[in-house]
Regions:
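Short, acidic/polar
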Residues: 35-45, 69-71, 93-105, 187
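Active-site environment of divalent metal-dependent phosphoester hydrolases
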Residues: 8-12, 60-63, 92-96, 120, ...
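Conserved, mostly hydrophobic/aromatic
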Residues: 5, 45, 74, 86, ...
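Active-site-adjacent beta->alpha loops and helix N-cap segments on the catalytic face
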Residues: 67-71, 95-99, 122-132
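An N-terminally biased module of ancient metal coordination in phosphate/nucleic-acid-related enzymes
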Residues: 1-58, 65, 72
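Generic structural signal for well-ordered alpha-helices
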Residues: 38-42, 71-75, 101-102, 129, ...
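Catalytic pocket-lining loop regions of alpha/beta-barrel enzymes
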Residues: 108-112, 123-206
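Active-site mouth loops of central-metabolism enzymes
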Residues: 23-36, 57, 85-94, 116-123
Length: 206
């Protein structure tokens, strides 16, 4: 079994190594008191019958002053265990986002893209994001997009509405989009997108 949606935010080794790691966990996710060694994380995967985990960072530095793990941290974790598969995250509204994505895939070995319009404070139908989608399509990697409700403070529910992705889904027909969390509470809208477009998949993570 593969856990397709894992945010590596409570790794003790990173809390010890990176000064802002604890602050990030508290500021973005309102957590940060139960850090655990990487070995414990792997043991928990064993207990749950999970063979591999997809690690998803979120580059929300512009909107939140922090990133939910960096691309380099995810690549480091993947180097520590073959049971991890890392995705990259870039902020579509930042200059050089498309080039950064290409670097993450070609140089860091990351295998996909994670976007979170709610935490990153952008609309997924913003044409400024087109260059990022275009590079992802050219690289042949999937993009996981947070859809549905976000519990994080100071986030707009509208940003998680899956229908905001329809223009991009139609325009970039060779790019596979994974709608995270089944877009709850917009489950029917997400279902309709997945039925209409062959490049749309649904992630059932809570």
């Amino acid at each position: 079994m593969i856990d397709f949606h894992t945010h590596p935010v409570l790794i003790q080794e990173f809390a010890n190594k990176y000064p802002n790691y604890i602050e990030m966990a508290r500021e973005v996710f309102q957590i940060g008191n139960n850090f655990q060694p990487l070995e414990t994380f792997l043991l928990q995967m064993d207990v749950a019958g999970i063979s591999q985990a997809i690690l998803l960072p979120i580059d929300c530095a512009r909107a939140r002053n922090h990133s939910v793990s960096s691309n380099e941290q995810v690549a480091e974790l993947c180097g520590r265990s073959s049971r991890f598969v890392g995705f990259a995250s870039v902020d579509p509204l930042k200059d050089g986002a498309a080039r950064e994505l290409e670097h993450c895939v070609r140089d860091l070995g990351l295998k996909g893209l994670k976007l979170d319009p709610s935490l990153q404070d952008f609309r997924p139908d913003d044409a400024k994001a087109w260059s990022v989608y275009e590079v992802a399509e050219a690289l042949g990697i999937p993009v996981v997009v947070h859809t549905g409700m976000s519990w994080a403070p100071r986030t707009a529910l509208e940003s998680g509405q899956p229908l905001l992705l329809e223009k991009a889904i139609g325009r970039f027909s060779k790019l596979n989009f994974v709608l995270a969390h089944f877009a709850w509470p917009w489950v029917w809208e997400a279902t309709a997108l997945s039925l209409k477009y062959p490049n749309v998949y649904l992630d059932t993570s809570c």
